[in-house]
């Protein structure tokens, strides 16, 4: 089900070891260190491959994540806010990644702009607890979702490039 390029990307993202969620005190701090290490490596790999497509940061507790993601289509950059909370049952439960400004624009999205990752991503996540983390959610969840949905939304006219929408006023 996973293509060779995705397998290569995944192999380069460090796996996590600590099975801890936000209520697990010191273990959660250890898990957060692993999460940051994994994310930094994934972003670094993306930059080296000229495939840089998101920035994330978290609140002090590491329970709320936010940032930007972008998708290049026909040489135009489409940028979106991205956000998610770490579930109390994390890492058993994957985070639900949201792109709030796209809420209601596609059937592959839940209320609040949460992207649909049920069919393909969640079973894979479940088989890889606690080894998968936020970087894996981005690589296997948001990345493929953007690649499928954004061109379709642009084609249907539901998303307009910011420069084009400003010049048409």
From Swiss-Prot:
Transmembrane segments: none annotated. The active site is at 116 (glycyl thioester intermediate). SUPFAM superfamilies: UBC-like. Gene3D superfamilies: Ubiquitin Conjugating Enzyme (3.10.110.10). E2-like enzyme which forms an intermediate with UFM1 via a thioester linkage. PANTHER family: UBIQUITIN-FOLD MODIFIER-CONJUGATING ENZYME 1. This is Ubiquitin-fold modifier-conjugating enzyme 1. It comes from Nematostella vectensis (Starlet sea anemone).
């Amino acid at each position: 089900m996973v293509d060779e390029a995705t397998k290569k990307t995944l192999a380069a993202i460090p796996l996590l070891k600590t099975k801890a969620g936000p209520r697990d005190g010191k273990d959660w701090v250890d898990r957060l260190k692993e999460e940051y290490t994994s994310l930094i490596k994934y972003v670094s790999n993306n930059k080296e491959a000229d495939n840089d497509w998101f920035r994330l940061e978290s609140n002090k507790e590491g329970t709320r994540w936010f940032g930007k993601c972008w998708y290049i289509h026909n040489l135009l950059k489409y940028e979106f806010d991205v956000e998610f909370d770490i579930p109390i049952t994390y890492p058993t439960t994957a985070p639900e990644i949201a792109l709030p400004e796209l809420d209601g624009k596609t059937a592959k999205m839940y209320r609040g702009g949460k992207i649909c990752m049920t069919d393909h991503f969640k079973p894979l996540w479940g088989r890889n607890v606690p080894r998968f983390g936020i970087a894996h959610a981005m690589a296997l969840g948001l990345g493929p979702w953007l690649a499928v949905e954004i061109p379709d939304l642009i084609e249907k006219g539901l998303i307009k490039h910011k420069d084009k929408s400003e010049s048409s006023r």
